[in-house]
């Protein structure tokens, strides 16, 4: 994820960070300075159904600069990192062909990693084996993983059910540990572009305050009506759109299961917890080539960033 010196490679700007960190504002400011096109790299913002609750760009924002891959996927159709990465590659290519700078903006680390590093060519898991593994308790699965793939077990928390099950089913299905396949990733674009990455990591107390303020603003903008419309579609509860932050809490309030104050408290807590996980991920998963922004962004810094970017 470092800047390449090859003159044949086109530049790509990546602005990452947790929810409510100020990514969109920085992206627009940088895009104005660099003739950019903003490309969504946030899983929730792909979906058409939730503009307010996922903090998609406003109509005013989209009039300032072109925005791509926002609100393009119906909520009934779950998206994946691979699906998004293929679309992002096309949008990056289109931006370069039109003489503009592609600016990736988002907080979904898996999406970003898949685009840059590619995917591991893991063979399909037989449904019977998958069902067998996923019927185990997390304790049973972790114990089995410690025996069959101790390296994976050492990397995972004993309560991380999803990743434990995945590592165990891959080991049992292919006879190779997960890290074997991860070393064979293909399709990433990191070596084909000149990448400059920024990650915004506000202080924890400021991020918590921003999360709370943002949810209040979402309610003022009509988040409840948005969830009522979504509930009217009667989509399966396990779809990503139904698990978006705030949907479950607002839906519980609408059904009369909790009062309004409890709904607000629960939704804010869920937002803060999500932002905390993202903040931790970006602090530990990014290397020294990323420019880390820990404080408020001012116009002088934006000018400096733009000059640096245009010089690579």
Swiss-Prot record:
It comes from the Bacteria. ATP binds at residues 17-24. Its EC number is 2.5.1.75. It holds the Pfam family IPPT. The keyword tRNA processing applies. Substrate binds at residues 19-24. GO terms for molecular function: ATP binding; tRNA dimethylallyltransferase activity. Its cofactor is Mg(2+). One of its GO terms (biological process) is tRNA modification. Keywords: ATP-binding, Magnesium, Nucleotide-binding, Transferase, tRNA processing. The record marks 108 as: Interaction with substrate tRNA. InterPro entries: Dimethylallyltransferase (IPR039657), IPT (IPR018022), P-loop_NTPase (IPR027417). Monomer. HAMAP family: IPP_trans. Belongs to the IPP transferase family. Catalyzes the transfer of a dimethylallyl group onto the adenine at position 37 in tRNAs that read codons beginning with uridine, leading to the formation of N6-(dimethylallyl)adenosine (i(6)A). This is tRNA dimethylallyltransferase. The gene is miaA.
